């Protein structure tokens, strides 16, 4: 490691100070959350037919409660109603029944499944003709009040949904359709409002339905700029997004573990270390012979790394219907050992829960307890060959908000929109696709160039270039100070 002279260190410190004052460069790292919802008449329409087991219905109730928790509930804010259906329709509570969040949550806990058939069309008809009526607490149509129905179902309806859903949408009701398990996906599309990619959701089982609650929390949120309102704790920079915010630091500073305050970075360390985790799709559609090609792809990337305790560490996670850590960061200290562990990885088969894998990456793989190093660059490579069976948007966004560099690699039936959702900015440089597993080695070559050790922003390796940059910044700062002095002189003369 190069040792900086006293003069260089002084200049480096000065540059960092100037960058803090003048540079627009940001490194988003941490998010806060605060949400205020617009007035809404919201009716849940929930399938409790025989195919929904009691334990699964309890999962639905957890999902409903999580969405309700995020709302501003009140007579002049958001009102919530609940329609339960099977062969018949039962209104569990009307829009006017409960005016507090606590009362709503208690009412949800008391709901019991009905069993028997699946009359989804009848339930939607009840919602638009009865549940939104004046007598039940529905408010008059107004641009200031949203009318929303969220339908949750796990099967094929025994009646038609297309016409009644079209009438609901035409009357100004926004329809969301959530399908679980063996649901008829064409039915979901017939129910939902446009754009359908924002109004149709599918999960493989009720055990993961609560993952969708965050989506609806954000969908109902109308606060657009928490930074402008001052509802944040960021020390240097606040970046606003609907209902939330991201704390960041000026160039030359790093975000502390509290996600709010910043420290000047120190020379000779930081991003020269890389923690790299592979998230590998081991679903049934990959097939055993192609899974062996995926292993070679991983080893191809590993061969390009400087594996050591101080430079690159590698972790590996495989996912299908569940998530399995093959080995954590730091377990193996040589390329040879890493590649041997990759060769020994067994194929999981089953489903494609990419969202769950991304959440595992955030909650486990990049934690200190799993071998991640504070200050090391965090890189995730997600490899998949098909559409995810769970919701990926929240976890994908959070990974990027936390500063992880995310690459998305798709093969065959992989969905481009999902790859783009996962990939870091600029997206074109962080997502790759090929139609055939036999050509993934070409993607490996491209990735090798992308996964490089970033230059330490505090290292000042090129002193000539560095000094020129300092001089330029000093001149700019001098001009700004002169302009400020002139303004102060004018103000002083005005006062006198």
Curated annotation (Swiss-Prot):
**Localization of this protein:** Secreted, Extracellular space, Extracellular matrix
Give the free-text PTM comment from the record: N-glycosylated; reduces binding affinity for type 2 collagens.
Q: What is its main location?
A: secreted
The record's section on Pfam families has:
FXa_inhibition, Matrilin_ccoil, VWA
S-S bridge residues: 227-238, 234-247, 249-262
GO CC annotations on file: collagen-containing extracellular matrix; extracellular matrix; extracellular region; matrilin complex
Report what the protein is called: Matrilin-1
Say which species the protein is native to.
Homo sapiens
